[in-house]
Amino acid sequence: MNEQYSALRSNVSMLGKVLGETIKDALGEHILDRVETIRKLSKSSRAGNEANRQELLTTLQNLSNDELLPVARAFSQFLNLANTAEQYHSISPKGEAASNPEVIARTLRKLKNQPDLNDATIKKAVESLSLELVLTAHPTEITRRTLIHKMGEINNCLKQLDNTDIADYERHQVMRRLRQLIAQSWHTDEIRKQRPSPVDEAKWGFAVVENSLWQGVPNYLRELNEQLEENLGYKLPVDFVPVRFTSWMGGDRDGNPNVTADITRHVLLLSRWKATDLFLKDIHVLVSELSMVDATPELLALVGEEGASEPYRYLMKKLRARLMATQSWLEARLKGEKLPKPAGLLTQNEQLWEPLYACYQSLQACGMGIIANGELLDTLRRVKCFGVPLVRIDIRQESTRHTEALGEITRYLGIGDYESWSEADKQALLIRELNSKRPLLPRNWEPSNDTREVLETCKVIAEAPKGSIAAYVISMAKTPSDVLAVHLLLKEAGIGFAMPVAPLFETLDDLNNADDVMTQLLNIDWYRGLIQGKQMVMIGYSDSAKDAGVMAASWAQYQAQDALIKTCEKAGIELTLFHGRGGSIGRGGAPAHAALLSQPPGSLKGGLRVTEQGEMIRFKYGLPEVTVSSLSLYTSAILEANLLPPPEPKDSWRHIMDELSVISCETYRGYVRENKDFVPYFRSATPEQELGKLPLGSRPAKRRPTGGVESLRAIPWIFAWTQNRLMLPAWLGAGTALQKVVEDGKQSELEAMCRDWPFFSTRLGMLEMVFSKADLWLADYYDQRLVAKTLWPLGKELRDLLEEDIKVVLAIANDSHLMADLPWIAESIQLRNVYTDPLNVLQAELLYRSRLTEEQGKSPDPRVEQALMVTIAGVAAGMRNTG
């Protein structure tokens, strides 16, 4: 096993050495010596040397303000390099990758070996595959785009160095390039100076498409096709592309006043512009490659006499001209010019598909299949996956905004105040108006700014080319009227088709009521007629965990999904569950394969739609090869979940989960909501207040500027606890509940659940992962340095609880140590701890200095503030997730 990691370790130490040389060149030997001393002390402290641990603390506390930034940057940059090496390891022939595309082959073989499954059934499951990944601009992507690009280049260098027959002079060239890149990174400011605007975030999303997905998706489809041919003798149809991408960047206005209707309009245009840009590059290649003369009569008829000598080129050049005209028009629109639409403006995917597919069919018919299945096939698949919009956009808005808008309308019309009506009265008005032929909105009415914004957004959806908006998501949805209200507002804007409207259920109570709300909606005849047998529902992971703790939330999510699946099945409705899970465990993140197989039976029948957030986008789709591997994992998990569904849990297991849920929720809320010391402790023991200074995302950290934990967004809440290594939201309450059930004599039942029920074993696996990243001595050190003595007992109580929780989880899982079944992850955490620990200690020191300066009424020292931001970014890199 260690053989596998030796390549990773040697890359990590080689990159570290180059970084050391860079630091020495930039700042001199003494700074490098200081960094090296700290690194060695940290390594020894990790190995259990108490004297060196004390020396590490003293050394870091005694750094002068001038030394703070270089030391913080050294460890932070090192972690970024270690992550780059690890990402490369996951795709290198010597590392994990050797087996990743194999995952599809393994799954197909496993399915073929099932006595009750035949090839036709498997083929049918493949044909109904549907995977929609929704890219969200959570403020968790802490690394700047500039640096992400350099990391990608470093990755290429590692790939070249891995080549066994590389000549010495080539090796020297690659090493020189590596030194340049690491020096460029060192001399680049890793912290953004301004918050990104929603448009910047959208551009970041387009960069992921251009740099990785554009190549990764066709490569994945080739891989999938190869495995299907080999194992089932089945070829994928040309137009079969089971994966699509949607984005929340520029569409998600929930709690983000910076995302306006104008911004969404701009991002839609920008997205189309980027699509023309990328397709132009493809067509440019095809113009030069498709020089063939032989063509079918159909193709020759299409090009006429003018194009007969080089029919394929002729068609490609015509398509290129259309793309260029479309691009010019979009450019003018983006600059605010109002131009008439040119003839042949590309607005629908068919306009791109038809000429390309005509060439494909002709090449196949004329015996040139090998040419047809080259670049041309990749471009055809990109048309299906990305098309004219590039990525579709979801619109997301909070339910109360629609209620307020309708309240304003009804008050103006003199028919009462919609906001204060009962649910039955609201539904009566909405259904009456939805059935009515006359408009609801008065012509000369001047709405308030907030209402105008809601109505304008609906207008943007109505104007957008069909297919460029994927869904309208209603956050904090609680009642049927929340869904009907959006349908009415969309109707008023002139949308003539059934736009998918997805309620998002995200608190414990809302999850528990989700099935009831959907049952009521499906009982409304008008609604049943509108949705034409299809319904999307979004399950919120992050807010429910923040509301009730991770154990109660995950059981509520399971039960809500289970009930919705059964209700929709009975009603003959195709349900798509949309999972809003984050990168971190406290926000529902889990290794994809395990997470999907742990859902209720039938939950993936309508395909998988899931958010991919912030830094997870880079870890899963940052390079074409990583994209292939991530999409392959998803594909095999969906096939397996649909063809070999997990067992229905026994009634006794459900009762135990109900019990665990109640106890864990009471424990969690007992601390977070009811303990008067908790909020002051949270504010002082974590960098929660300082996080607000980081220019991370375009959305504010709080939904409302005042208030306690409940007003915080789920992401800063998790981010803050990840920084001080207590990782509290991801475990609080869970272990206490498990302990209580063990004491009631049900340990053997829990062990059986762990063995035979994927839902439960995944929960425990996620707890183990969090426990591996948590650190008691560091959390204790934050308390000693930053927390008032009166609050120390609370910190001690929480740490003792964590220690007890670890013991009980290991006992139920029958493991002697954490992550026993995932040594690769344990290895990766150990490797990074040596570099993350000094950043944590330094962060506590910087928080202490920064807060002291503030208390003394002095103006902040920019060196301290900058170093603090760097430690926050560094710890995030070390933990491999932020919020």
Swiss-Prot record:
The organism's place on the tree of life at top rank: Bacteria
The keyword Lyase appears for this protein: yes
GO cellular component: cytosol
InterPro entries xref list: PEP_COase, PEP_COase_bac/pln-type, PEP_COase_Lys_AS, PEPCASE_His_AS, Pyrv/PenolPyrv_kinase-like_dom
Names of the cofactor(s): Mg(2+)
Gene3D superfamilies in UniProt: Phosphoenolpyruvate/pyruvate domain
Keywords: Carbon dioxide fixation, Lyase, Magnesium
MF-aspect GO terms: magnesium ion binding; phosphoenolpyruvate carboxylase activity
Keyword match Lyase: yes
Known catalytic reactions: oxaloacetate + phosphate = phosphoenolpyruvate + hydrogencarbonate
EC number: 4.1.1.31
SUPFAM superfamilies in the cross-refs: Phosphoenolpyruvate/pyruvate domain (SSF51621)
BP term (GO), one: tricarboxylic acid cycle
Active site: H138, K546
Record-stated family: Belongs to the PEPCase type 1 family.
NCBIfam families: PRK00009.1
Function as written in the Swiss-Prot or TrEMBL entry: Forms oxaloacetate, a four-carbon dicarboxylic acid source for the tricarboxylic acid cycle.
Name the record gives this protein: Phosphoenolpyruvate carboxylase
Organism this protein belongs to: Salmonella choleraesuis (strain SC-B67)
